[in-house]
From Swiss-Prot:
Presence of keyword Kinase: yes
Name of this protein: Bifunctional protein HldE
Binding site for ATP: 205-208
One GO term (biological process): ADP-L-glycero-beta-D-manno-heptose biosynthetic process
The species this protein was found in: Citrifermentans bemidjiense (strain ATCC BAA-1014 / DSM 16622 / JCM 12645 / Bem) (Geobacter bemidjiensis)
Gene: hldE
SUPFAM superfamilies from the UniProt entry: Nucleotidylyl transferase (SSF52374), Ribokinase-like (SSF53613)
InterPro entries: Bifunc_HldE, Cyt_trans-like, PfkB_dom, RfaE_dom_I, RfaE_dom_II, Ribokinase-like, Rossmann-like_a/b/a_fold
Superkingdom of origin organism: Bacteria
Length: 487
């Protein structure tokens, strides 16, 4: 998605009404310094300098959705204790609707205390009740869902296995969503995913998907196998598996998996990143985005979230800025690899056939142009990988290139047959091919198919290699020789 499309999405988000059903908790952070060892035991002494109390669990989903601009209501159970009162007050401050919030006198409101020093967690202390909610609370939630589900555009289920999401509650949620045509988006937990049957989409991480499916995920084939099994037995519309540094993989029930690479960045804390994913994904589906576009924006948001310490929200302007990063001119065809990866994932999600070729393209001539035009004719999108100046020098000698990389890139981008240009500094485009996953890999007729770099990668994904003959007598070297001999 381009920057303007993302901005338009967030403008529409302000009218969305979301219901969050799940386990609420408080996240307490004690920030300090650990510069000495206790004389009482061989443990660090943390001198607390700052304390911070935030909404956690399903509360962090509420926090994220509110930060993204939509109207949020809560359906859950807390204790009639001090932490419950603090949690209720925090939700009220976010403007959340609390008609579906129930209390139990004997229940302990979940609170997780994290002690940090030098931006590192030292210990976590949990205070909580994990047993299922009382029958009266369960019936209260079911009645609330029956009466109020139609008031919302999306239902978000945040399961932390703290007892709120009983089988009866989950059944009521999924039934309401199906009957009313409302997306039900679930962040699952535990080994038994049968309780989520009938939801719209689940967002497990790789490890959770392995446990739930019983398939060890080691490559693309096993990933697809795990996803297919879960999709069929749970009657889902789609499955989104988050894969840490490998990004996300979206598996629609109708077929056509979409793999969304992550944007490389320094990771400070993954706490709450899953809450960010489900919040943005849910909002996207409620706004009518395709599954692929909603997942793509969620991936961008998650990349921002892991760069922050603690359960933090991601603001719309941060996501918009990240989408625009590396592409100051939104109309430019010249992209860095991270930005291009997102663009190509979106093209794939639309069923477009992506063609990739590469070269130095130093002193562009008619042979190059005809070659590129033929390559474009093989598919819908043509991506050209362009060797940087350093790469050209290693391949062709210190006197090359004649034209520096920025100018070569702009010359190529001016051709109508080219959709994207990406520079690469390596001797081969293997990294680019692995990242983009083109459907067709094109090289000149002087190559053999077996010798084309990246062939195995493309063919393993169901793609193919094509060889295109060059125009006889046309080459940069011959042009240089003619200039030297004639002038």
């Amino acid at each position: 998605m381009e920057r303007r499309e993302v901005e338009s999405f967030f403008e529409r988000a302000t009218s969305i009404r979301a219901l969050v059903v799940g386990d609420l908790m408080l996240d307490e952070y004690l920030w300090g310094r650990a510069e000495r060892i206790s004389p009482e035991a061989p443990v660090q002494v943390v001198e607390v300098a700052r304390e911070d109390l935030r909404l956690g669990g399903a509360g962090n989903v509420v926090n994220n959705l509110a930060a993204l601009g939509c109207q949020v209501s809560v359906c859950s159970v807390i204790g009639s204790d001090e932490n419950g009162a603090l949690l209720r007050r925090a939700l009220e401050e976010k403007g959340a609707g609390l008609e579906g919030l129930f209390e139990e006198g004997e229940r302990r409101t979940s609170k997780k205390t994290r002690v940090l020093a030098a931006n590192q967690q030292i210990v976590r202390i949990d205070r909580e009740t994990k047993s299922s909610i009382a029958a009266a609370s369960e019936q209260g939630i079911i009645d609330y869902l029956a009466a109020r589900s139609g008031d919302f555009d999306v239902i978000v289920v945040s399961d932390y296995l703290k007892g709120v999401l009983t089988p009866a509650v989950l059944s009521a949620v999924c039934r309401s969503g199906r009957e009313l045509g409302i997306p039900v988006v679930v962040d699952p937990k535990g080994n038994d995913y049968g309780k989520y049957r009938g939801a719209t989409i689940l967002t497990p991480n790789r490890k959770e998907a392995e446990i739930a499916s019983g398939v060890a995920i080691t490559d693309q084939e096993s990933l697809q196998c795990a996803a297919s099994g879960l999709l069929s037995c749970l009657e889902l519309d789609a499955l989104l598996i988050t894969r840490s540094e490998a990004g996300m993989s979206l598996f629609p029930a109708a077929g056509g998996a979409v793999h969304i690479p992550t944007v490389a960045r320094e990771v400070f804390d993954v706490t709450g990143a899953g809450d960010t994913v489900i919040s943005v994904l849910s909002l996207g589906l409620a706004c009518g985005l395709t599954m692929a576009d909603a997942a793509w924006i969620a991936n961008v948001a998650a990349g921002i979230a892991v760069g922050k310490l603690g359960t933090s929200t991601v603001a719309p302007q941060e996501i918009v800025a990240e989408v625009g990063h590396g592409a100051k001119d939104s109309d430019s065809k010249i992209k860095n690899l991270d930005v291009l990866a997102h663009a190509i994932a979106r093209e794939h999600s639309r069923g477009k056939k992506v063609v990739f070729t590469n070269g130095c393209f130093d002193l562009l001539h008619v042979g190059h142009v005809k070659y590129l035009q033929k390559a474009r004719g093989l598919g819908d999108i043509l991506v050209v990988g362009l060797n940087t100046d350093a790469s050209v020098r290693r391949l062709k000698g210190e006197k090359r290139p004649l034209i520096e990389e920025t100018e070569r890139a702009h010359i190529l981008a001016a051709l109508d047959c080219i959709d994207y240009v990406v520079l690469f500094d390596e001797d081969t485009p293997l990294k680019v091919i692995e990242t983009l996953g083109p459907d067709i890999l094109v090289k000149g007729g002087d190559y053999s198919i077996e010798g084309v770099v990246g062939r195995e990668v493309v063919e393993a994904r169901g793609g193919r290699v094509e060889l295109i003959q060059f125009v006889d007598g046309r080459s940069t070297s011959r042009i240089i020789e003619k200039i030297l001999s004639s002038y």
